[in-house]
């Protein structure tokens, strides 16, 4: 399952220092897909993938001192098309 993770940065320089020193600090089974950061270094929109939501919670525990999180389960457009087609039949 994919999740849109919206991160609201408290301290961008500290976040990037930790990222440089420790990496993403993700448990096995949680996969980083891609991310986009606004020009003001205040918000990051990140797509993560896992079959176990608990892994996402563990990852958040490693970063929650430096940012606030909003987690939204998402589907690809292709998945939605297939879902709608199945419901129509």
Language model feature labels by segment:
Residues 1-89:
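Conserved, structured core segments of small domains
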């Amino acid at each position: 399952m994919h999740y849109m993770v919206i991160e609201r940065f408290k301290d961008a320089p500290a976040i990037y220092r930790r990222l440089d020193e420790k990496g993403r600090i993700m448990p096995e089974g949680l996969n980083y897909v891609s991310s986009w950061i606004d020009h003001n270094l205040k918000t990051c929109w990140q797509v993560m993938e896992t079959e176990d939501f608990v892994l996402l919670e563990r990852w958040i525990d490693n970063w929650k001192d430096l940012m606030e999180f909003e987690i939204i389960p998402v589907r690809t457009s292709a998945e939605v098309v297939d879902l709608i087609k199945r419901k129509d039949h």
